[in-house]
Structure formats: C-alpha cells, structure tokens
C-alpha cells in the first residue's frame, strides 16, 4: 500500500520517538526526507542521520535524536503544506516560527532550506513544516 504523505509520516515518526525517549528513528528513505533530516541536523535539532541500503533497491533513513537535560530538543514538529492543500509563499511572506526561535523548512527551486536561508537567497517556495 502506498503512503499518502511520506513527509508527514517522517515527521510523526520523529515526534513519537522523541515523546517516548527513543534514541533513533528509522523510516523509508527518499531524497526529500534526507534533505529535511540534513536541515534538522544543520540546525542542531538532531544529532546524526544515516542512509542504509536494503534489498530490492530500497534504502532506510536512520535519524539519531538529540536530547537536552532529558527532554527532546524538538518540542514542536508540525506539517504545514500537505498533499491536499499545498502552501506556497513568496520571499516576503515566509513565516517566522516562534518569532525566529524556531525554523520553517522550505522547498525552493534552489533546494530544501530553512526560512532564514530562503530569505537570504531571495527565494520563496513550498512551506513543508515548522520546527521549534
């Protein structure tokens, strides 16, 4: 059975694993999921990520979660644009999360990046999710 929204599935897996205190999360891998995980790593929300090749030409993404004083670093992880209602924003309309304390992950023509990076490059795009 195919998945309707693989990005939402990844975000829910991360959120649920962090809520119960797991160290790692495994999910089916894709280029966009790896790019989102890389942004999370670059921004300090996760410790590490690994892509492992499986049989049948498939791969698995493993994310090592980050905790501070026993609490997950990711407090809020929310999907914004979804398969039924895509949310596109121009460079001047990119949302700030928690007044700049969190990040928005944006899919632009120049790749997947944070809202701050998109503003700096002067590009807009699809707002994938919010992280705080």
UniProtKB/Swiss-Prot annotation:
Which PROSITE patterns does this one have?
A: RIBOSOMAL_S8
Q: What is this protein called?
A: Small ribosomal subunit protein uS8
Q: Which InterPro entries match?
A: Ribosomal_uS8, Ribosomal_uS8_CS, Ribosomal_uS8_sf
Assembly: Part of the 30S ribosomal subunit. Contacts proteins S5 and S12.
One GO cellular component assignment for this chain's record is: ribonucleoprotein complex
Name the HAMAP family for this protein: Ribosomal_uS8_B
Alphabetical UniProt keywords? Ribonucleoprotein, Ribosomal protein, RNA-binding, rRNA-binding
**Pfam families recorded:** Ribosomal_S8 (PF00410)
Function recorded in the entry? One of the primary rRNA binding proteins, it binds directly to 16S rRNA central domain where it helps coordinate assembly of the platform of the 30S subunit.
**Source organism phylogeny:** Bacteria, Pseudomonadati, Pseudomonadota, Gammaproteobacteria, Lysobacterales
Under the heading PANTHER family, the entry gives: 40S RIBOSOMAL PROTEIN S15A (PTHR11758)
Q: Record's family?
A: Belongs to the universal ribosomal protein uS8 family.
Molecular function terms in GO for this entry? rRNA binding; structural constituent of ribosome
- Swiss-Prot/TrEMBL GO biological process terms: translation
Entry's NCBIfam families?
PRK00136.1
Judging by the UniProt lineage, the source's domain of life is Bacteria
């Amino acid at each position: 059975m195919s998945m309707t929204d693989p990005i939402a599935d990844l975000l829910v897996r991360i959120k649920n694993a962090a809520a119960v205190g797991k160290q790692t999360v495994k999910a089916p891998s894709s280029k966009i999921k790896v790019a989102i995980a890389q942004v999370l790593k670059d921004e300090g929300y996760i410790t590490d990520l690994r892509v492992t090749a499986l049989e049948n030409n498939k791969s698995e993404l493993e994310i090592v979660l980050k905790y501070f004083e026993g609490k997950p670093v990711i407090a809020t992880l929310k999907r914004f644009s979804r398969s039924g209602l895509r949310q596109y924003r121009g460079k001047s309309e990119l949302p700030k999360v928690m007044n700049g304390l969190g990040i928005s992950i944006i899919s632009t023509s120049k790749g997947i990046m944070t809202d701050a990076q998109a503003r700096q490059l002067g590009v807009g795009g699809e707002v994938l999710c919010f992280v705080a």
